[in-house]
Amino acid sequence: MSAITEAGSSKFIDVTEGEINGSIHVNDAGNGDEVVVMFHGSGPGASGWSNFHRNVDAFVDAGYRVLLIDSPGFNKSYPIVTKSRDGAYAQAAKGVMDKLGIKRAHMIGNSMGGATAMRMAVDYPEMVGKLVMMGGGSVGGSTTTPMPTEGLKLLQGLYRNPSMENLRKMLDIFVYAPSTLTEELINGRFENMMRRPEHLTNFVESLKASGGRANYAHLLPTLTMPTMIIWGRDDRFVPLDLGLRMLWGMPDAELHVFSKCGHWAQWEHADKFNQLVLNFLAR
């Protein structure tokens, strides 16, 4: 069994692609011929490792090479203010793949990372094998829940007023069972958030510059790659009806819903998630 560490898999790749011109941090693990790229969400202090540390070993053990990309403006990647957001994050991923000589990979994205994965499928379909999106994908507003949701309000409030108190408020509704969040995880997230204050202010500026998240709902019928949509029934950040919209719109999609699950399916139900997605990729 693998024992991948953050430090042992860490590398930096200089990327010049579109509006991206800087150093992108990547955790690169495994040496399989098939590659899986994982994209993190948008919460303050988010990183590829913090989002997917419960998943990377299982995928490497199954024979995949795994890339956890810190999107520009997050964690160890270079700071940026971007108007296109998803477009810039996809450009960064393309640049990383090009530098590493990877022509095609499966894309897995959580929340904002789901929108990044979808943007990869829109802009660079030839580089995308299968697509997996959890609690995200950027297909407009909910028809069942007032927007922005309580979770997104807390997230944006944390960016504007970063503190341990506000972080705990957000994390309390981030997962179904907040008692499962360890002090080590919470403290690590706080330290990561406060280590790069420029990322926090830049994210707020990017929100203003972009005018909100893009809506790819009209493009769903063109995304023909096999797709698995995964949602938490109890997600208080991105409502489940958006997953249903994606299911209805994409030609080759399936939806799996975890009960007793919030916005972090790959962490809250890691073992089941790993097996579900590995089975999907192996078909």
From Swiss-Prot:
Annotated function: Catalyzes the cleavage of the C5-C6 bond of 2-hydroxy-6-oxononadienedioate and 2-hydroxy-6-oxononatrienedioate, a dienol ring fission product of the bacterial meta-cleavage pathway for degradation of phenylpropionic acid.
The UniProt record lists the keyword Hydrolase: yes
Family classification: Belongs to the AB hydrolase superfamily. MhpC family.
Catalytic activity: (2Z,4E)-2-hydroxy-6-oxonona-2,4-dienedioate + H2O = (2Z)-2-hydroxypenta-2,4-dienoate + succinate + H(+); (2Z,4E,7E)-2-hydroxy-6-oxonona-2,4,7-trienedioate + H2O = (2Z)-2-hydroxypenta-2,4-dienoate + fumarate + H(+)
Gene Ontology molecular function terms on file: 2-hydroxy-6-oxonona-2,4,7-trienedioate hydrolase activity; 2-hydroxy-6-oxonona-2,4-dienedioate hydrolase activity; monoacylglycerol lipase activity; protein homodimerization activity
Recorded superkingdom: Bacteria
Gene3D superfamilies per the UniProt record, alphabetical: alpha/beta hydrolase (3.40.50.1820)
Record-marked site positions (Transition state stabilizer): S111
Name of the protein in its database record: 2-hydroxy-6-oxononadienedioate/2-hydroxy-6-oxononatrienedioate hydrolase
Annotated active site: H263 (proton acceptor)
Keywords: Aromatic hydrocarbons catabolism, Hydrolase
Residues with site note (Catalytic role in ketonization of the dienol substrate (substrate destabilization)): R189
Recorded GO CC terms: cytoplasm; membrane
Organism, scientific name: Pseudomonas sp
Residues in AB hydrolase-1 domain copies: 35-269
Involved pathway(s): Aromatic compound metabolism; 3-phenylpropanoate degradation
Cystines in this chain: none
Complex formation: Homodimer.
InterPro entries: AB_hydrolase_1 (IPR000073), AB_hydrolase_fold (IPR029058), AB_hydrolase_sf (IPR050266), MhpC_alpha/beta_hydrolase (IPR023791)
Gene encoding the protein: mhpC
EC annotation from Swiss-Prot or TrEMBL: 3.7.1.14
PANTHER family for the chain: MONOACYLGLYCEROL LIPASE (PTHR43798), MONOACYLGLYCEROL LIPASE ABHD6 (PTHR43798:SF5)
GO terms classed as biological process: 3-phenylpropionate catabolic process; acylglycerol catabolic process
